[in-house]
Each structure stands twice: as structure tokens, then as C-alpha cells.
Regions:
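Flexible, polar/low-complexity N-terminal or interdomain linker segments that lie immediately upstream
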Residues: 1-38, 110-133, 139, 262-268
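Short loop/helix-cap segments at secondary-structure boundaries that form the rim of catalytic
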Residues: 37-44, 157-161
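Short, structured coil segments at secondary-structure junctions
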Residues: 42-44, 88, 143
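Short acidic-hydrophobic, aromatic-tinged amphipathic segments that line or gate anion-handling sites
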Residues: 49-50
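Catalytic cysteine-centered active loop of the rhodanese-like fold, especially the PTP/DSP P-loop
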Residues: 54-101
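Gly/Ser/Thr-rich loops at beta-strand to alpha-helix junctions
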Residues: 73-77, 126-127, 154
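Extended, well-folded catalytic/binding cores that form a central cleft or groove in large enzyme
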Residues: 117-125, 132-268
């Protein structure tokens, strides 16, 4: 097998190209408890599970979605976990080189912060930041997060009642800071470094704070967001469609900025009737 790539492995770069969208695999950190505790970083969107308890937690994984597991260096721990998941019927692979190779490649990690109940609450009738933030949380922090929309006056009370994290309201941790919006604050607190996400953050900031000069895409995001809000009375229905929009915008920020689109030069224009 020298020089050959394992059929059940994935490179850091190939995994990165899948992240940030609904097509991303479930990403599970199977570092041994001591290794996990010794580090203050984790790969974005990954959640930790004990490698010696696979028989239990594998039953909780949704059917039909690919799974990628990683350990420190892509060695026996993650390879054994991937094999066990495959034997249980999952489409499983391990990350080549583990979180070490991922980090050395400059790919995005986040600060390892506990996220309370996994619930987040904000004001109803979202437009930009309150759709962009759930996308960011779901795609980069907690893929199992739940989002609650309530009247402005009820946000803090509902947060206290449910243990949900309040965001994009005055006086809380996850909110606007100066000229930066709540999306920026989440990126800062969780210490996520990703050039594509930085580009997207600029677009969101410009659209959310009426500074469309920050990036030429700001005005387009503003227009589409207001149009979505006008078309959906149900905030969660709007969020569902907004997730697709931000998946597409993030993909463009990451991989498609060099793409162009124009009328094919080789295609003759129709001739006007004489």
C-alpha cells in the first residue's frame, strides 16, 4: 500500500472544499479524551465523541450522510473509528494527518468553547444578521444547533427560561460591536480564521449596516434578504431558504471568485428581421 491513498480516507483540502454547505459530511473528533482535553482548538463544525464508545454513539448518527472522523495525526484511533462506523453501515472516512495536518495546512479551526444547550434565541422577523448568524453557527460551530425567534421584548426572558444563548440584541455577548455586526462577533469569540469566511463577513456586515461600499455583493445580499423576508411570514421557513443562500455565497467566497459569466462570444446574435 506504499504510496497509495486509502479508499476510506480524505485529505484536508478535499474535506475543506465540502465544508460550509448542506453537503458537508458529519465531522466527528475522536481524539482520545486526554488529547482532546489538552488542546484548546477543534476543527470547525466538529463535535467530540469518545473513540472507545462508538457502539453507543454511532446509533445516534443520521442515516445516509457521510461521516469523517479525525484524531491527532490520522493514525490508529481515527482509522479504527472509521472502520467501525463503516461496519455499522455508515459511509465513513478518516482525515489524513488528523487535526495536525489540517492545522498545518492553515485550514479553519475554532476555539473549543462549550455551547450551553445548543439553543440560540433572537428577535423575530429576521432580515440579514439573524439569518447569517444561524448559518454560521450551524456550519462552523454546532451542526445540531436549534434557533428560536421571539418578539424583541421576550428574547432575554426566553433565554433564561430555556437556557438558549441570546444573540443580535442589545446588552448580550453575541451582538454588534461598534461598526461590526453579530456575525463578526461570533467569528471573533470562536476565533475562526478562514479567508472565505472573512470575505463573507464583510458582505454580511455591509448589507446589515447599510455600508454597501464594503463589497460589491453587499447590495445584492441586502436586496435578496429583504425579498426573502417579504415572501415568508414564517421565520423558520425563511431560515431554511436563507441557509441555501448563504451556502451558495460562502461557496463563491471560497472557490468561485475567478469564475466569469457572459454571453458566449462564439454564439452569433440573432439577426433582426428586415
Amino acid at each position: 500500500m506504499d504510496g497509495q491513498k486509502s479508499s476510506n480516507s480524505i485529505s484536508p483540502r478535499d474535506l475543506y472544499e465540502k465544508l460550509g454547505t448542506a453537503q458537508a459530511p458529519i465531522l466527528i473528533d475522536v481524539r482520545k479524551p486526554a488529547d482532546f482535553a489538552a488542546s484548546d482548538r477543534c476543527i470547525v463544525a466538529a463535535f467530540h465523541r469518545a473513540p472507545d464508545d462508538i457502539a453507543r454513539w454511532s446509533k445516534e448518527l443520521p442515516a445516509g450522510r457521510p461521516v469523517v472522523v479525525h484524531c491527532v495525526r490520522g493514525g490508529q484511533t481515527s482509522q479504527t473509528a472509521a472502520a467501525a462506523l463503516a461496519a455499522a453501515g455508515h459511509d465513513a472516512a478518516y482525515l489524513e494527518g488528523g487535526i495536525t495536518a489540517w492545522s498545518e495546512a492553515g485550514l479553519p479551526t475554532r476555539r473549543k468553547l462549550a455551547v450551553a444547550t445548543g439553543k440560540w434565541v433572537t428577535r423575530e422577523r429576521p432580515k440579514i444578521d439573524r439569518i447569517a448568524c444561524p448559518w454560521l453557527i450551524s456550519r462552523f460551530i454546532d451542526p445540531n444547533a436549534q434557533f428560536i425567534y421571539v418578539p424583541d421584548a421576550r428574547v432575554l426572558a426566553v433565554a433564561k427560561e430555556t437556557g438558549a444563548i441570546p444573540y443580535d440584541v442589545k446588552g448580550v455577548e453575541y451582538t454588534h460591536e461598534g461598526e461590526r455586526c453579530s456575525f463578526d462577533t461570533i467569528v471573533r469569540i470562536h476565533d475562526i480564521h478562514d479567508p472565505a469566511l472573512d470575505r463573507l463577513a464583510t458582505i454580511v456586515r455591509g448589507a446589515d449596516t447599510s455600508r454597501h461600499d464594503l463589497a460589491e455583493q453587499c447590495g445584492g445580499l441586502f436586496a435578496i434578504s429583504l425579498g426573502l423576508s417579504a415572501n415568508f411570514a414564517d421565520d423558520h421557513a425563511m431560515l431554511k431558504h436563507g441557509m441555501v443562500m448563504y451556502d451558495a455565497l460562502y461557496t463563491w467566497c471560497r472557490s468561485l471568485q475567478a469564475e466569469t459569466h457572459n454571453w458566449p462570444a462564439t454564439k452569433p446574435l440573432p439577426q433582426a428581421a428586415v
